[in-house]
Curated annotation (Swiss-Prot):
Keyword annotations from UniProtKB, A to Z: Aminoacyl-tRNA synthetase, ATP-binding, Cytoplasm, Ligase, Nucleotide-binding, Protein biosynthesis
Catalytic activity, EC: 6.1.1.14
PANTHER family on file: GLYCINE--TRNA LIGASE, CHLOROPLASTIC_MITOCHONDRIAL 2 (PTHR30075:SF2), GLYCYL-TRNA SYNTHETASE (PTHR30075)
Originating organism: Listeria monocytogenes serovar 1/2a (strain ATCC BAA-679 / EGD-e)
Coiled-coil blocks: none
Name of the protein in question: Glycine--tRNA ligase alpha subunit
Annotated GO MF terms: ATP binding; catalytic activity, acting on a protein; glycine-tRNA ligase activity; transferase activity
Amino acid sequence: MNLQTMIRTLQDYWSEQGCIMLQSYDVEKGAGTMSPYTFLKAIGPEPWKAGYVEPSRRPADGRYGENPNRLFQHHQFQVVMKPSPDNIQELYLGSLEKLGINPLEHDIRFVEDNWENPSLGCAGLGWEVWLDGMEITQFTYFQQVGGLECFPVTSEITYGVERLASYIQDKENVFDLEWTEGISYRDIFFQAEFENSTYAFETSNTDMLLTLFDTYEREATRQMQDGLVFPAYDYVLKCSHTFNLLDARGVVSVTERAQYIGRIRNLARRIAKTFYESREKLGFPLLKEEGGKRHE
């Protein structure tokens, strides 16, 4: 099964479980969790079921295309369901079966790995899912997002697209993966991987990046003053990516690192609170029943 077919199979499966299928969000981010389709939608009592592929940029993980498993940019297939179904783990195993992986014939383990994203004020109970010794998925029940307690609980399933495809195709090197017939992962992404690694470690203008972080932070704050959550959040994502670029260049000290993360977290918390209040003023419109429980 090539990678394109694998993604389509997951999309079809989760669509059958009631998830809407979205396109990736067009601002740089380090993980699918950071998309507003997860971060914002996990806030408050309104139900939400969605799936999407999210390119995830992690500058410090770039290896110029020389490492078979570490990348500047990888892909995640993200599934979020709120409230979390009681049978969410069974649904996940069903998705593996659709990919030709019979849980009865393989060693599938849920290894406890509680999750935290300090820069966004997020935390939850979590497990890594290991398939025959390879981690392929992160499974999380959100307890807190943007400093707000989650009620009802959102379940998040994050498939590592390249890792899962490597297992299915029995490839040791991600660049040898077949994306679709006649086209390899290398054909599509190798040049970008090399050049982005060069940029992240060698040629980025750190003075400019420092200025950009401050500019993005001010703009996020300014938009929040007008109650514009989504524009503000875009700039928080830009702050996060800019910080990651600075971190990759090694120009941020240990003390400064904590300070930058704290600045991003403060913005994220303000946005979460503002978003909750804005939805509350609208009467939480996605709640179909009057008896829906409210976030306290």
